[in-house]
């Protein structure tokens, strides 16, 4: 008879110690593998509290972390599911945040900044070669392996990371951290690997002067700055920065993602690969002083958010391999990871694609209609007299014989749209459709129908797989 015993491998093999960080559904604790004495950081997720979508995200994070093996990336050593909990066993990184270490140094130069960004670029390049986009590159996720001098920079927190095919650009949702978001994400355009390079540009700018290129307490104004690429190199602090460093920043902060420098190209830039002869060795005390203020502002706003989170269930709050004070920040700062806005943006996306589909119908554009619909589209509609219709032939008849031949103006609006998101790649929308048209006598008329549409995303594109319409037929009968 098959054993139904619950897995207790983590409990059997590891000993837990103090807490290192905390999120809404997870806690990070130091642990030790009993057989070897080797220390790790265990991210312990309470799976009883996770939604189906959160489960998918956890599986994605574990899958991505298992794939990435690089000296500049926090390594996942084990992933164990037990009753009610999932354990992700990572490298124990004890050096804290890179930015906190820099301000404690007695000497810090452009050459040091070059060495830091080189390690970050190595980690990003490894991600991109493996089809992974991090999406949340920022100081909080740049850690040091140990307190030793010259310890490696480690990229952490793959909670928002996504898997992409080659140079695929698609809309993967609104996610990231405000001050580090790329113009294409803010425009809600398809995006891919270049978003990480934009964030690298923001990080490099801060590494050189201690403050960010884009900053405003008002998030809308901040986003306008980013979309316009409105940054500069003000005097006097930038006067002592070499032209090569500024050139690399300009190549990273290029608005057009197709023209933005890639990680592999950036690693070949003279300021990186010829550091000893190109980057300045002058100590940058002003940068260290500014960076102290920048860090203090991040920590203060983090403390405010922690207080806010204590009073509500906030699933986006998460902590991975952070120092106890490495907390997230309030939404008006530029350092808060945002993914809840992703839900709002995705719902808006479903409304937009539904409007595009209706526009194709109004225009009698069967080609545009077929691009938005799944070839096996199923439907219940008044024209089919209660029968389930499958495929496109039934609809083709109306496009060829009624819709395309109607040259009278038709105007449609969607009222009270309600969108239900079903996981990452499916959604359902219900709405009332009002269609205005001119009848045969030149009189304005209005038709109303109630519609529900089911959408499925394949290869980054939404397709209508089913709809149910009651009320008036689509085509004005006496038009």
Curated annotation (Swiss-Prot):
Keywords, in A-Z order: ATP-binding, Calmodulin-binding, Kinase, Nucleotide-binding, Phosphoprotein, Serine/threonine-protein kinase, Transferase
Entry's EC annotation: 2.7.11.17
GO terms for cellular component: cytoplasm; neuron projection; postsynaptic density
Highest rank taxon of the organism: Eukaryota
Record-linked InterPro entries: Ca/CaM-dep_prot_kinase-assoc, Kinase-like_dom_sf, NTF2-like_dom_sf, Prot_kinase_dom, Protein_kinase_ATP_BS, Ser/Thr_kinase_AS
Activity regulation note: Autophosphorylation of CAMK2 plays an important role in the regulation of the kinase activity.
Binding locations of ATP: 20-28, 43
One Pfam family recorded for the sequence: CaMKII_AD
Subunit structure: CAMK2 is composed of four different chains: alpha, beta, gamma, and delta. The different isoforms assemble into homo- or heteromultimeric holoenzymes composed of 8 to 12 subunits.
PANTHER family: SERINE/THREONINE-PROTEIN KINASE
Family: Belongs to the protein kinase superfamily. CAMK Ser/Thr protein kinase family. CaMK subfamily.
The protein's name: Calcium/calmodulin-dependent protein kinase type II delta chain
This protein's encoding gene: CAMK2D
